[in-house]
Swiss-Prot record:
InterPro entries xrefs: NA-bd_OB-fold, RNA-binding_domain_S1_IF1, S1_domain, TIF_IF1
Name of the protein in question: Translation initiation factor IF-1
One GO location term (cellular component): cytosol
Disulfide bonds: none
Annotated organism of origin: Psychrobacter arcticus (strain DSM 17307 / VKM B-2377 / 273-4)
Keyword terms: Cytoplasm, Initiation factor, Protein biosynthesis, RNA-binding, rRNA-binding
Domain S1-like: 1-72
Positions of transmembrane segments: none
Length: 73
């Protein structure tokens, strides 16, 4: 997949699910299921309910995404 096809959104974690999955409400109001990117997992970055995050999505499946950044609170 080419980098230019990735869609990036900001959102807020509203629920934590098993296996490092999270329910995220995007800034446009949609709710998606997102997982942590590999670098965040490698560096043990913790994500909690209420955190502001940046999510990458593909145009092929707009119900799933990858969390790439956790905002500083």
């Amino acid at each position: 997949m080419a980098k230019d096809e990735i869609i990036e959104f900001e959102g807020e974690v509203i629920d934590t699910l098993p296996n490092t999955l999270f329910k995220v409400r995007l800034e446009n109001g949609h709710e998606i299921i997102a997982h942590i990117s590999g670098k965040m997992r490698k560096h043990y970055i913790r994500i909690l309910t209420g955190d502001k995050v940046k999510v990458e999505m593909t145009p092929y499946d707009l119900s799933k995404g990858r969390i790439t950044y956790r905002g500083k609170n």
